[in-house]
């Protein structure tokens, strides 16, 4: 069958055959369903000029683009998972999956389901198994004690019970928080998210340890390496000297170029970005070792060219481009609503970060990467995710997505997320990815582990952890391939070997200094005494009256003027009216 000329009629016929041919092996039937789904997705996304992480993200994208109902979308993704398996399906499951596939084909091709197929499939969805009934989105609590099944807590809400029990495991709803056994301490604060409360038992989908201790999202993502993600990797990365390489300078340029392209309204000049970027980063350019100016300019021009194409795809500025996007069923994003590098704090998840590009209506979220992606260059998918995106970049994007969800109370299908590898043309580099809940939870679990480790070291002293900073301990995945031994392990040893060659006096000094730094960092994040105005968590923990008394906030401000410092830039200067803030402010 010619994939380039596939029709809905042919795909419907394949569905009819997988339901009616009597001699098909179960695994052959599943593969036939899977191949039909692939053909349908190929037809749906072939003109989008975007790359897709895997079949999961293609299905997710097309369901959003075609306005498929949430219940049907769940059924379609269930069918996709079943088709990936060689396990035989029951006759009932096969019919429900065939129904989901038929609905998907109908939506993608915008054609009615033929009668001869319609009579073979159920007219309603598979009975939905009701999951956890969420009746409280967020509960702050303090740990009293715990056992293998429950954490006993005092909650920071009006409540009838003096003590609540937080369930650690619920197999029916695929909830497992038992990794917390090794992290919990009496007096530890927790955020319980997406909870079912049946007094006195709380069953949360997500638990965040010491949420006032904000961790930078990019720092978490960097720790997802080919050799695993040990909690001490976070501290190891903090010990590394700040990188100043041609690659980091190119990444900074690419971010500036995206900003200029968005705000240039079709009149972009790459040389202007090069000049302004050099003015802002003159010291870094001058001190960058082995800097190759000619190669930098060539690479920068390629990045800018690719970014211009990406912006035209995401924000069509001509009627013909907009019409083509609408014809493909894609969401249209408003360039006027685009904002670059907005910063967020998320007390719910205990993380903070700066998004590369999003729209103010939260319909679009883009994370940009300027470096190489060998999966794209070799056309080999990551076996863990069957996709081309790199794991740390996927983690970073999912955490930003989680911030938007929890800060703005957004549903799962509200935000469209993209990974942008700007070294490559949009058909390879502008990658549509889907929300992967398992990896998101793994990232939050890792965040909890590194926070607990930081608290423990700050309390007990760095000397108790010093001997754990070795490649053998940090390599939790047991990786021993050529790339690890040739490149990654020597990078680790550059930091860890000097730690084990210290004299007793040097070791005592270094451990005392690290303990002091970690304690100061902890105080700056969570504070040492309430009301002293010393920590970043005062932003959400300090009452308004105390903020006013401390001169920590202006209220009732109004924007009276906005200005551009130069043509082609966004509005970067605003004038505010400041009413009287009260006596002794």
Segments predicted by a language model, with ranges:
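Helicase P-loop NTPase motor core of nucleic-acid translocases
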Residues: 1, 126-127, 382-388, 416-420, ...
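Amphipathic alpha-helical interface elements
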Residues: 1-113
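Short amphipathic alpha-helical face segments that pack within enzyme cores
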Residues: 31-35, 249, 253, 395-403
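Short boundary/loop segments of OB/S1/cold-shock single-stranded nucleic-acid-binding domains
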Residues: 112-139
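Charged, glycine-rich intrinsically disordered N-terminal tails and low-complexity linkers that flank
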Residues: 130-140, 161, 167-288
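Conserved ASCE P-loop ATPase motor domains encompassing nucleic-acid-directed helicases/translocases
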Residues: 134-198, 526-585
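Mg2+/Mn2+-dependent nuclease catalytic core
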Residues: 153-185, 333-448
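A non-catalytic, helix-rich entry segment at domain boundaries
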Residues: 257-340, 508, 515, 521-525, ...
């Amino acid at each position: 069958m010619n994939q380039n000329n596939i029709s809905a009629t042919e795909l419907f016929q394949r569905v009819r055959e997988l339901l009616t041919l009597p001699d098909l092996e179960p695994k052959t039937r599943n593969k036939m369903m899977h191949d039909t789904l692939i053909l349908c997705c190929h037809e749906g996304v072939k003109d989008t000029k975007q790359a897709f992480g895997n079949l999961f993200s293609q299905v997710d994208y097309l369901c959003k683009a075609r306005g498929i109902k949430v219940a049907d979308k769940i059924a379609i993704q269930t069918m996709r998972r079943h088709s990936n398996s060689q396990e035989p399906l029951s006759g009932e499951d096969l019919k429900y999956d065939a129904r989901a596939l038929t609905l998907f084909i109908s939506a993608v091709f915008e054609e009615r389901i033929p009668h001869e197929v319609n009579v073979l499939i159920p007219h309603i969805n598979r009975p939905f198994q009701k999951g956890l009934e969420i009746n409280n989105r967020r509960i702050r609590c303090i740990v009293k004690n715990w056992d293998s099944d429950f954490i006993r807590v005092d909650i920071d809400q009006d409540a009838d019970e003096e003590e609540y029990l937080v369930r650690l495991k619920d197999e029916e709803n695929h909830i497992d928080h038992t990794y917390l056994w090794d992290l919990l301490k009496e007096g530890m604060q927790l955020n319980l998210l997406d909870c079912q409360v049946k007094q006195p038992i709380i069953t949360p989908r997500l638990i965040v340890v010491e949420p006032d201790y904000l961790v930078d999202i990019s720092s978490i993502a960097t720790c997802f390496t080919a050799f695993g993600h040990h909690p001490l990797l976070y501290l190891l990365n903090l010990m590394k000297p700040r990188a100043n390489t041609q690659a980091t300078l190119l990444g900074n340029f690419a971010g500036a170029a995206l900003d200029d392209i968005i705000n240039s309204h079709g009149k972009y000049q790459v040389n202007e970005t090069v000049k302004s970027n050099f003015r802002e980063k003159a010291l870094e350019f001058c001190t960058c070792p082995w800097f190759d100016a000619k190669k930098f300019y060539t690479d920068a021009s390629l990045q800018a060219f690719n970014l211009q194409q990406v912006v035209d795809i995401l924000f069509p500025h001509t009627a013909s481009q907009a019409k083509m996007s609408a014809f493909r069923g894609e969401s249209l994003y408003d360039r006027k609503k685009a904002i670059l590098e907005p910063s967020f704090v998320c007390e719910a998840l205990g993380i903070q970060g700066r998004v590369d590009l999003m729209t103010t209506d939260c319909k679009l979220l883009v994370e940009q990467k300027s470096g190489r992606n060998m999966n794209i260059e070799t056309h080999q998918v990551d076996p863990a995710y069957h996709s081309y995106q790199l794991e740390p970049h996927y983690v970073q994007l999912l955490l930003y997505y989680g911030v938007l969800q929890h800060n703005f109370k957004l549903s799962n299908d509200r935000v469209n997320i993209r990974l942008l590898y700007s070294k490559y043309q949009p058909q390879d580099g502008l990658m549509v990815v889907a929300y992967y809940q398992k990896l998101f939870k793994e990232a939050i679990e890792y965040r909890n582990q590194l926070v607990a480790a930081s608290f423990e070291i700050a309390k007990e002293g760095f000397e108790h952890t010093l001997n754990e900073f070795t490649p053998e301990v940090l390599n939790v995945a047991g990786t021993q391939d050529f790339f690890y031994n040739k490149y990654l392990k020597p990078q680790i040893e550059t930091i860890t070997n000097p730690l084990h060659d210290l004299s007793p006096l040097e070791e005592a000094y270094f451990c005392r200094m690290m303990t002091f730094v970690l304690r100061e960092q902890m105080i700056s994040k969570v504070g040492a005494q309430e009301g002293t105005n010393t920590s970043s968590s005062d932003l959400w923990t300090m009452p308004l009256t105390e903020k006013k008394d401390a001169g920590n906030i202006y209220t009732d401000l109004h924007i009276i003027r906005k200005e551009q410092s130069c043509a082609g830039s966004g509005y970067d200067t605003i004038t505010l009216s400041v009413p009287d803030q009260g006596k002794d402010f």
